[in-house]
């Protein structure tokens, strides 16, 4: 997931329309497809470290810029090399919260990471018009 954020050339597209449950929304994030990202590794940072057992998650802080970056605004020019994630809001206590639909998107991964010496956290890719990053919950 980290490759998509730091090497996937994320672009916020506030113009693209999409629908959910019969409602029209607007906005989401474009990322390069994994076969278009040089050296893509699903469970590694770009330096080769396996993030599933990385002790950095012990000190994860969502306000630390280490875990996020600013996306480019607008649709990418190489759209056929990209995939789109709609800004569908987020899941809270098992319920999809769409009040931020069109502005904020959050997608869980199936990759657990060690949060401290005894517990695991789930990883979440999140984005808005001004930020794209990783959360460890």
Regions from the language model: what does each represent?
Residues 3-137:
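C-terminal, surface-exposed recognition/capping segments
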């Amino acid at each position: 997931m980290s490759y998509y954020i730091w090497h996937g050339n994320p672009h916020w597209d506030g113009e693209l329309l999409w629908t959910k449950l019969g409602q029209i929304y607007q906005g989401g994030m474009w990322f390069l497809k994994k076969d278009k990202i040089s050296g893509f590794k699903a469970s590694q940072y770009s330096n080769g470290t396996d993030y599933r057992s990385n002790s950095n998650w012990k000190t994860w802080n969502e306000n630390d810029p280490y875990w996020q970056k600013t996306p480019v605004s607008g649709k990418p020019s190489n759209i056929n090399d990209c995939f789109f994630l709609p800004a569908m809001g987020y899941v809270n206590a098992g319920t999809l919260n769409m009040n931020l639909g069109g502005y904020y998107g959050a997608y869980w991964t199936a990759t657990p990471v060690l949060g401290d010496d005894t517990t695991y956290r789930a990883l979440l890719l999140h984005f808005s018009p001004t930020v794209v990053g990783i959360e460890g919950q």
